[in-house]
């Protein structure tokens, strides 16, 4: 069974690159009927944030990325890691190193002066004497000093590292007994039954060390897929301005889970020319072997386009529920179908849609002064007065077409073009010269509110 995992460090909030990795891991597990596990790598006590850890879980819940089983927290597993440190010591595959910080610094300076690679020199690798006084020991693993470490990668192919170029006897447990990052990653991937690791290629340099640990402990090495980074339009690392921000900020900006996940799955993976993917299609079609080897480009316009597509195609009842995030309660509004049908074609984000809804259902808080001056003068005043007179005579109007008919009557009787009524009426109803179809606006707010808004606007220009 394929088992994947997502293993963020809660030293900051979940960002877009991490979410893409999580999505790829989730899809591959679900496609194969496997498990998708969540592990919080919170061993860095100085930098970790409980708030950030909770935000990761919150983001998963918002996006519908269900993980299997309980969340694994590395900070709760020190006793487990200690067992494997002891095993390596007992088997002679690891040893205590007593070099002081001063000795290590001096060694590094000498190597740099000689233009050599900085590394631990193995001083205590085969030490069997009396330990020096007053120096706490770290635990180092006996890494291979020659030969090749081959990372069998599903994206990049076989990546070959020469041991002498990249390895030394690296630390697996600090002087205080706490285990190091690469050590706990290897232990947990084994104990959690992880068979395939999908992660950013910034982790590729860690992989040889993890393979050394797997092999020293007799563990199976998982399959790796190292995914190229996401770059901005200039081919540089994403900044917060480009989109490298907290995932939950996308919710606040008004992006839907479906759009964000669709956007992310196409960053570095494709299925022909297809752009729109439902979650079911993603689960069916995704294969990490089709991940591009080059970096993907973050494109805000593409995200906006996808988001507008999903807004247009979301059932109105569901949209109304989404808008509750913006303190809008329209689920029970008797004209919500007309309202949302008129507006959702105009919005790129839910936040924009919420603003458009507010502008329709509430009278204008202010008016565009230039629009008032340009549109509500001369003949326009007569046109609007004729319109509200006809509207007042109507007992019931419900549909946009019925309001349109009243407008058409005024146009026909006065022998004017439709723009002569449309522009001043729009300013009167919405306070500006742009907006959705007027017949839909009036169908939503009703006869009385329409008349009230027109009279209020006319009062401003008398």
Curated annotation (Swiss-Prot):
Keywords: Aminoacyl-tRNA synthetase, ATP-binding, Cytoplasm, Ligase, Nucleotide-binding, Protein biosynthesis
Catalytic reaction list: tRNA(Glu) + L-glutamate + ATP = L-glutamyl-tRNA(Glu) + AMP + diphosphate
Keyword Membrane attached: no
Motif ('HIGH' region): 8-18
Major localisation: cytoplasm
InterPro entries, per the entry: aa-tRNA-synth_I_cd-bd (IPR045462), aa-tRNA-synth_I_codon-bd_sub2 (IPR020751), aa-tRNA-synth_I_CS (IPR001412), aa_tRNA-synth_I_cd-bd_sf (IPR008925), Glu-tRNA-ligase_bac/mito (IPR004527), Glu/Gln-tRNA-synth (IPR000924), Glu/Gln-tRNA-synth_Ib_cat-dom (IPR020058), GluQ/Sye (IPR049940)
Annotated GO MF terms: ATP binding; glutamate-tRNA ligase activity; tRNA binding; zinc ion binding
Compartments, as annotated in UniProt: Cytoplasm
Motif ('KMSKS' region): 237-241
Any one Gene Ontology BP term: glutamyl-tRNA aminoacylation
PANTHER family assigned to the protein according to its UniProt record, in alphabetical order: GLUTAMATE--TRNA LIGASE, GLUTAMATE--TRNA LIGASE, MITOCHONDRIAL-RELATED
Assembly: Monomer.
Record-stated family: Belongs to the class-I aminoacyl-tRNA synthetase family. Glutamate--tRNA ligase type 1 subfamily.
Identification of the protein by name: Glutamate--tRNA ligase 1
Gene source species: Sulfurimonas denitrificans (strain ATCC 33889 / DSM 1251) (Thiomicrospira denitrificans (strain ATCC 33889 / DSM 1251))
Taxonomic placement: Bacteria, Pseudomonadati, Campylobacterota, Epsilonproteobacteria, Campylobacterales
